[in-house]
Amino acid sequence: MKALVVDDSLVMRKVLIGALSRANITDVDQACDGAEAVAFAEKVEYGLVLMDWNMPNMLGIDAVRGIRALGKTMPIIMVTTEAEKSRVIDALKAGASNYVIKPFEPATIVSKIQEVLNKVGTTI
């Protein structure tokens, strides 16, 4: 399975790639903003996307909307410092599959990855 990690922080992208590796997902593309994420999703069939909220050029929630507007149905997990309940609800309404608040324990993100993939019948 191919995954996409979207975050403007290189350090966070590396952390998320490490979490994906722990979930046995090693084929990973990286994007540094929402606009780049939508462009990637238009060209590549991803099995999973990990998306930050606050990024330059296009917010993560707008990228989720853009990806869903393309007809893409892959799981998208928001991984963000936006901890307000209203943000979680907004993300889920926009099409996010799940939500993880930074900072997080590595086991938490791995568990969320497995959870969303199980919901869509994907095994890793």
Question: Where do the language-model regions lie?
Answer:
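Two-component/phosphorelay signaling modules centered on CheY-like receiver
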Residues: 10-29
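Acidic, metal-coordinating helix/loop segments flanking the phosphotransfer/catalytic sites
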Residues: 30-48
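Receiver (REC) domain active-site loop signature in two-component systems and cognate sites
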Residues: 55
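Short, conserved "switch-loop" micro-motifs in signal-transduction and mechanochemical regulators
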Residues: 82-83
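C-terminal output helix
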Residues: 104-113
